[in-house]
């Protein structure tokens, strides 16, 4: 029986790339999307029929479900292959991730409102609001990633970090009656499962969720899913100037 599986890449650098992120010229996407322009510099490799034999994939923030494939070089400049698409290489900019830090498991901080120490630690985050119609605010996030760390151990955070039940809550003016809401991040490899699904509490008028997580610094956001349609930004909003990693 398979216990777990994980996708990985074997990387062998054969060429250089030059990548830039631009706003789209198409005004429909000017405020919300990013267009990736790039060049492939072959160095000592000779690309024969690159439009047929060269396969290009772009990923946003190491998330495989974001990939754009099969872009063809538009023209050649000296030895460089140039890709200067507008809409064909577009991504939603998204928003900076929310975050919390439980490295000091007994203490509150900027984004933690309360810690219950009476049993297995329970960490209550401050209430989040939907950001779809808010202005962009820069936040130096780690693009959905997480880092295990603790101030309570003496040597190795990965083995000495403790666990805590982290309580999430989302207040939203939007109606998500036909959508499922999830807590989203690399902490579970961006999966949508019953464990990171949120449930509506009508008495508090909040969506709530609880995750058992090891001490550390975590990025997260809230996303919605309606049947087979996934929307990563209808709660957090999307901005063309958001900082992202592309590869």
Predicted feature residues:
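A short beta-turn/strand-edge loop motif at beta-sheet boundaries
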Residues: 44-51, 174-177
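Long, internal scaffold/assembly segments composed of regular secondary structure
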Residues: 47-140
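Low-complexity, Pro/Ser/Thr- and charge-rich linker/hinge segments at domain boundaries
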Residues: 4-33, 242-247
């Amino acid at each position: 029986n398979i216990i777990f599986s994980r996708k990985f890449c074997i990387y062998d650098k054969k060429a250089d790339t030059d990548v830039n992120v631009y706003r789209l010229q198409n005004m429909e996407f000017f405020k919300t999307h990013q267009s990736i322009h790039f060049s492939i510099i072959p160095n000592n490799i000779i690309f024969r029929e690159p439009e047929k034999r060269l396969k290009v994939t772009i990923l946003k923030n190491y998330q495989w479900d974001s990939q754009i494939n099969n872009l063809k070089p538009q023209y050649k400049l000296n030895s460089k292959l140039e890709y200067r698409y507008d809409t064909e290489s577009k991504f939603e900019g998204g928003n900076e991730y929310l975050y919390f830090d439980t490295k000091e498991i007994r203490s509150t901080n900027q984004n933690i409102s309360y810690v219950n120490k009476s049993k297995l630690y329970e960490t209550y985050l401050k209430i989040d609001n939907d950001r779809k119609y808010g202005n962009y605010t820069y936040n130096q996030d780690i693009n959905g990633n997480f880092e295990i760390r603790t101030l309570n151990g003496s040597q190795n955070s990965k083995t000495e970090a403790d666990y805590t039940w982290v309580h999430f809550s989302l207040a939203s003016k939007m109606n998500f009656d036909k959508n499922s809401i999830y807590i989203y991040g690399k902490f579970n490899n961006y999966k949508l499962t019953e464990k990171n699904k949120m449930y509506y509490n009508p008495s508090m008028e909040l969506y709530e969720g609880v995750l058992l997580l090891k001490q550390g610094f975590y990025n997260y956001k809230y996303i919605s899913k309606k049947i087979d349609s996934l929307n990563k930004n209808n709660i957090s909003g999307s901005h063309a100037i958001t900082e992202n990693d592309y590869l």
